[in-house]
Amino acid sequence: DKTKQKIAFSFLIAIFLAAFEGVVVSTAAPVIVKSLHNFKMISWIFSIFLLTSAISTPIYGKLADLYGRKRIFMIGISIFLFGSLLAGLSQTMHQLIIFRGIQGIGAGAIFTIGFTMIGDIFTLEERSIIQGAISTIWGIAGLVGPLLGGFLIDYLSWQWIFFINIPFGLLSVYILAKFVHEQKPATNPKIDYLGAILLSIAIGSLLYGVMSLDEDFYLGVILLVITLISSILFYIQEARTSEPIVPLFILNKSSIIVNIITFISSFILIACSVYLPLHIQSIMGYSATIAGISLIGTSIAWFMSSISIAKLMKKYPTNIIVMFSSLILIFSSWLLTQLTIDTPLWHLSIYVFFFGFGFSGTLNTLTFIVQDSVKYNLRG
């Protein structure tokens, strides 16, 4: 119905903005460095956004279960927009890094609660269409982000890559506030503050530790040791608290397998997203526009695969769908490893089409499995 269409539209807006902010800074980086006069810290405007969003994601999931999806999702978007405003007003690189961190904190809610609310509001067939649209939005953000960023920088200023989020984000908030209705949780919420702190330390030290290994090996090792210690303490804390951030009973054999498959699939996706455009432009000698057009098949395949998943799940066991999709993903990934400077561009376009089909089939099926395997109050 029209109400669901409006709600889906608001989700797509929010997810596009968060995805857009993850990629657009790469286009603006040279101009930002020139404006704020600090080249040494340029990498932090990328990494801090990813770091804070990764830390906040599981915490938002639990808060959504305790206080309601709509409330926490709108708080997350508001934090994201506030960070966008401050980032655009930054006068120094230190300020920009801090405000990008605030953006990432808000983006964590968009990434996790958006998918949770889709599972709550829409039927299986509707979810498959929306998941396909979301996959397409991610692809569009990756392709259009640098182009739109370049346009804003050339005709306005680099600050507008942040300011542009505000009107669209407010539109998303308005639609959600008006059309999404949910019951308030029946129980009095209790927040596991210690668990949230330990989880934040574990994730933050892991990500920063891995990033530090090349430049400062000993610092990286120390941070990874901190990750191990804080993870053990987090496990102990979750085992004894009444409202754990991550209920330990969901960490069964099946969920571990799902997470491993998701991690590997996402790892491959990120690697391809980073290196394929570089290969097309730097190795094969094509323009950025041609690179974007060559990779658009990934988004098309994502959408096609997502639409077909719901129908296939009614006819075949989900493990068969995941296995078949994973085989397509593995085979297409192997094809991509065979790329050379002489590989025709249309070959690469076919490879990424199959890659997108396999990735979408794998990840979307796993998402449906996870959402349908737990109660409403644990979906976050």
What are these regions (language model features)?
Residues A28-A54, I97, T289-I293:
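Extracellular/periplasmic helix-loop-helix junction of adjacent transmembrane segments
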Residues K6, M41, E126-A133, I290, ...:
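Cytoplasmic loop-to-transmembrane helix junctions
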Residues L51-I55, L85, L89, G139, ...:
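Hydrophobic/small/kink-forming positions within alpha-helical transmembrane segments
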Residues D154-T262, I268, S273:
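Hydrophobic transmembrane-helix bundles of small-molecule transporters
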Residues A29, A141-I153, L206, P277, ...:
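Small-residue (Gly/Pro/Ala) motifs that create kinks and tight helix-helix packing interfaces
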Residues T57-L194, S212, Y376:
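Helix-loop-helix hairpins in multi-pass membrane proteins, especially solute transporters
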Residues I7-I13, L17-F20, V25-T27, F46-I48, ...:
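12-transmembrane solute porter fold
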Residues F16, W44-L51, S78, G132-I140, ...:
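Transmembrane alpha-helical cores of Major Facilitator Superfamily
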